[in-house]
A protein has these predicted regions:
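Intrinsically disordered, low-complexity linker/tail regions enriched
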Residues: 148-150
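His/Asp/Glu-enriched, well-ordered alpha-helical/loop segment
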Residues: 1-6, 11, 16-142, 153-158
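Active-site and NAD+-binding cores of ADP-ribose-processing enzymes
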Residues: 145
Length: 158
């Protein structure tokens, strides 16, 4: 295939040098912000402070022009996309909110998070021409609720 769309899945430990190399090679990233739900409590103990600060650089990837797609890697974490969007936007764990924001420099806007979940994922699977068929009806307007409310959005119909 002439139009390969190579990607790295589980790129939460990619450092800035590796991210620059991904950009140079046109490699996309399929990442799981929701992993912070569990990892936020253990990442510094397991990796040390320096490596912790060089992990979960998903917004850095995005800002450098790397195509970033979101996934949950269910059943590792719950499949609920609103939990993932919440974590990408807040940098907080739903399980351990008392631990605060993981990295304030790596927070996505709502528009960016939705792009990573929709348009980019369609592109990654060569399905960008199909995205007009999908819809969901939810109990809250995601554009008019607080970041904290996003994690509680319920799908009413799909």
């Amino acid at each position: 295939r002439a139009n390969h769309r190579h990607s790295i899945i589980h790129a939460q430990l990619a450092n800035k040098g590796q991210i620059n190399r991904m950009r140079e090679l046109g490699i996309s990233a399929i990442v799981q912000p929701i992993f912070l739900n569990s990892d936020i409590a253990i990442v510094e103990k397991r990796l040390g402070k320096t490596r912790k600060e060089e992990s979960y650089l998903f917004k850095t990837m995005y800002d450098k022009g790397i195509k970033v797609g979101f996934s949950t890697d269910a059943p590792v974490e719950l499949v609920n996309p609103f939990h993932n969007i919440y974590t990408a936007m807040s940098g907080k764990s739903i399980k351990n909110p008392e631990l605060g924001v993981f990295n304030t420099n790596e927070l996505f806007s709502l528009e960016e998070a939705l792009e990573c979940y929709t348009d980019t994922n369609y592109w990654l699977t060569y399905d960008e021409h199909k995205n007009y068929n999908d819809y969901i009806i939810v109990d809250k307007d995601i554009n008019n609720c607080s970041i904290e409310e996003i994690k509680d959005i319920q799908v009413l119909e799909a």
